[in-house]
């Protein structure tokens, strides 16, 4: 059965040529045309498009997680980043549109596979693996969408005209959808793959650990983090001895990463790689507060920033992020995060000290970084230690804003960082183009936009 889908989404195309292109995004028709599903191999070709969209989700997620918070500041000329950094984001912001667009592109591709796969002759094992991969990628996209925008429309069909009328789901409904997708994918994927650029059962369990941490389901967060740490139903991931080796491509602790090459434009639907934003143009730089935090408690993790006094002038503090090279992969999940997730889940269950405790988990990460170990903390003290440890260990990987929002610490922390922070900054705006083209979103914009 021939499956043809015309996917209409709104993404952002950026070029090096014109700043106007950055500030005036053009609607793009994403077409999966003449893809004839005849066997598992043809389905994998379609699935490649979803992986390509995952790549396009990389940098916008980092921008959302670190620039919206206090880890990064704007240092260049582009309005879309200035808006985010100054907490003056508009509904026409290009980063918001890019992130929203790629979520629905991934969703359409998953729907395409779900509609087409039952019509072809493949084994049950192949069907399970293909649909589980599609479900994981769609779940990850909606997970990011829910915590960036709040509840969003849940699209599971390829009928474009119907999809343009789908109303916004609630935040809880969106998360229920994510959980259903992940639990479907669980144990249907191989434990190992050629490299960490492919979704495995370890990636499913890692996202479940993060999902349940965000949901404050502490026992399940601990369970799935432990599964990944101990290799229960996953490959054996090994914590790198040195932090510097932990953040290189295909490290022994990498669970899932976005793979880039010289032929790609890493991170967004743009010609700007994340490295170009951080190093080439220095459009975005680490905040002075982030630099000081790394100097005080980062230990070996300071390796991800460098100082050049020739850049230090005006609001430019002279520091540059060197976490990513020109075509370096973006790590979505790595083993160190699982230790920190388990530490937080254990703290919330009052398993703070002793064997199999939050302290033992957090000290694994701190010992590698070469910073003093933690002992004798109260529950509240330990939660602040973990907040800081997530900031140090996962710096510039797109977590900080989401962490501050989910823990209710955003206002306290951000009021010390900027006088511009307001409650509206706890969510990004729904892109104006989406509201214009979907009548069901007309009165559904997030407060303050």
Would you name each region that the model predicts?
Residues 218, 352-355:
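TPR-repeat structural position
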Residues 47, 107-110, 114, 175, ...:
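Inward-facing hydrophobic residues that define packing positions of alpha-helical scaffold repeats
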Residues 33-34, 60-80, 155, 190-270, ...:
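Short, surface-exposed recognition loops and adjoining beta-strand edges that mediate ligand/DNA contacts
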């Amino acid at each position: 059965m021939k499956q043809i889908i015309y996917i209409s989404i709104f993404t952002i195309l950026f070029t090096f040529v014109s700043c106007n292109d950055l500030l005036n995004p053009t609607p793009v028709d994403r077409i999966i045309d003449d893809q004839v599903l005849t066997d598992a191999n043809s389905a994998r070709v379609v699935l490649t498009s979803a992986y390509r969209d995952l790549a396009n989700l990389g940098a916008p997620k980092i921008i959302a997680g670190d620039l919206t918070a206090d880890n990064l500041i704007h240092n260049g000329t582009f309005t879309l980043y200035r808006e985010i950094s100054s907490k003056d984001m508009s509904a026409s912001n290009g980063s918001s549109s890019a992130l929203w667009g790629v979520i629905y592109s991934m969703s359409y591709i998953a729907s395409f596979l779900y509609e087409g796969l039952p019509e072809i002759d493949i084994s049950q094992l192949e069907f399970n693996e293909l649909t589980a991969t599609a479900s994981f990628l769609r779940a990850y996209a909606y997970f990011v969408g829910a915590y960036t925008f709040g509840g969003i429309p849940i699209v599971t069909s390829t009928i474009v005209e119907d999809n343009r009328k789908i109303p916004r789901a609630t935040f809880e409904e969106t998360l229920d959808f994510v959980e259903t997708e992940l639990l479907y994918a669980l144990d249907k994927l191989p434990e190992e793959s050629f490299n960490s650029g492919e979704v495995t059962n370890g990636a499913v369990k890692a996202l479940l650990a993060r999902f349940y941490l965000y949901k404050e389901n502490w026992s399940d967060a601990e369970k799935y983090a432990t599964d990944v740490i101990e290799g229960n139903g996953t490959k054996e991931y090994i914590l790198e001895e040195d932090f510097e080796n932990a953040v290189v491509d295909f490290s022994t602790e990498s669970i899932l990463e976005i793979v880039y090459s010289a032929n790609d434009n890493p991170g967004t639907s743009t010609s700007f790689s994340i490295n170009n934003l951080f190093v080439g143009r220095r459009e975005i730089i680490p905040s002075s507060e982030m630099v000081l935090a790394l100097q005080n408690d980062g230990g070996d993790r300071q390796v991800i920033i460098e100082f050049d006094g020739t850049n230090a002038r005006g609001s430019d503090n002279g520091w540059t992020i060197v976490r990513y090279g020109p075509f370096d992969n973006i790590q979505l999940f790595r083993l160190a995060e699982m230790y920190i997730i388990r530490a937080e889940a254990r703290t919330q269950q009052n398993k703070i000290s002793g064997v199999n405790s939050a302290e033992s988990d957090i000290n694994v990460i701190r010992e590698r970084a070469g910073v003093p170990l933690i002992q004798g903390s109260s529950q509240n003290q330990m939660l602040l230690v973990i907040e800081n440890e997530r900031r140090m260990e996962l710096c510039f990987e797109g977590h900080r804003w989401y962490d501050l929002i989910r823990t209710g610490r955003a206002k306290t922390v951000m009021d010390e960082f900027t006088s511009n922070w307001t409650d509206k900054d706890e969510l990004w705006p729904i892109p104006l183009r989406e509201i214009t083209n979907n009548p069901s979103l007309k009165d559904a914009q997030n407060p303050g936009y």
